Design a protein with these regions (language model features):
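PRPP-associated nucleotide enzymes
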Residues: 1-152
Length: 152
């Protein structure tokens, strides 16, 4: 790890046997566009490696899903292994463009439901990744103003 003027740069080692960095991305519903931009940048970064080894990988994004049942409940599924990886989960709780069917009606996801999807994906990892980092454009539940009365 290299620290330079408050920015932390991680040095990843490209494994010769598996041609892998141990880096993985998961996008929760509504954050796919941001995850794709990050993925494209990582692919160009590792394909232009100056370390003598180049990574030939199509994507860092792991296939995952948060399907919903008819009663509104959901579950988190990860279709690829996360064992030993540095996992970055990208979640956008401010995105109201994601909807789901609830008893025949299309309901937009609230920030609480986005946060629940994040917790479902973390629970689906079963503690197998080396490290889990959550990337959120908006810190959900991080109110920064003064309280006036007895409020949460």
């Amino acid at each position: 790890m290299i620290v330079n003027s408050k920015i932390v740069w991680y040095t990843f080692i490209i494994s010769e046997d598996t041609n892998d960095t141990g880096l993985a991305l998961i996008a929760t519903p509504g954050a796919e566009e941001l995850a794709t931009l990050i993925d494209k940048r990582l692919i160009t970064l590792f394909s232009e490696s100056h370390l003598g080894k180049k990574l030939h990988k199509d994507t860092f994004i792991l296939k995952s899903d948060c399907p919903r049942f008819t009663n509104g409940d959901a579950k988190g599924i990860i279709y690829e292994t996360v064992r030993g990886k540095d996992l970055y989960i990208i979640c956008d709780p401010g995105n109201h463009g994601v909807t789901y069917s609830f008893f025949g009606k299309e309901i937009p996801l609230t920030p609480d439901e986005h946060f629940e999807n994040l917790k479902r994906i973390i629970a689906a990892c079963n503690g197998k990744p080396q490290r889990i980092t959550v990337v959120m454009p908006m810190l959900y539940g991080g109110r920064q103003h003064r309280r006036n009365a007895r409020e949460s």
